[in-house]
């Protein structure tokens, strides 16, 4: 006899629907653990069907250690805005960023194979698969990154409820409470302006030569004499640096300052040099090609799923 309590226990353990739980228990003669396995197998099959669908929504989540010496950032994708704000989805994303901070792995693929920080009886990939089955959408841990510092701080900034996330590494020989505020300013700058590089040294040769060639052709097309073209090219390259290198950008909170000048002013106040050593900026779904569907196609897909 399958009791209501047995169904309730199985539902709480798996998140599956009530009728699915009752069928699984009946199939397994009331054996709870076997019923869990049956539902997991069915859940895995359902998840496999969903894995081909584009997951371009989701959130960016960050985690900063209490001493602000370590930080991590992850992008965790789903298919719709609706699921991206689901409590279970957000909780998993936040746990994944926390796990990344304390893990020795450096890629999302490696993190998927680790034991889950909130339940070490399961692997991260299996926890994600279970949530796919429960919420009915494909999900993907797309990427992770970590920063650490010995002297200085790591901080983060999240914009738009997880649409954009930033990690910043600030180095300073002197420990000062104000460093966290300064790092937050820099992180907000990165979120707002999306710099491509930290400084000029970070601009790779291929990118630089490509930009120079574009500016050279532009100058020649403007009918400028050959002898002044090179000077114009260098002027435009300097402008490129100022727009795309973080430390040369104008500070969004005060256009009279570049980020370098802002850090120099703060260094004087603290009494020690402050430098930005690294940053990471994630924007959810960037670079993912979304499949466009018209309304009729969407209705047909839902009807097919219901068969």
Swiss-Prot record:
Residues 80-83 are annotated as: Involved in Mg(2+) ion dislocation from EF-Tu. Gene3D superfamilies: 1.10.286.20, DNA helicase RuvA subunit, C-terminal domain, Elongation factor Ts, dimerisation domain. Pfam families: EF_TS. One of its GO terms (cellular component) is cytoplasm. One of its GO terms (biological process) is translational elongation. Its main location: cytoplasm. Keywords: Cytoplasm, Elongation factor, Protein biosynthesis. GO terms for molecular function: translation elongation factor activity. It is found in: Cytoplasm. The keyword RNA-binding does not apply. Associates with the EF-Tu.GDP complex and induces the exchange of GDP to GTP. It remains bound to the aminoacyl-tRNA.EF-Tu.GTP complex up to the GTP hydrolysis stage on the ribosome. Belongs to the EF-Ts family. This is Elongation factor Ts. It comes from Clostridium botulinum (strain Hall / ATCC 3502 / NCTC 13319 / Type A).
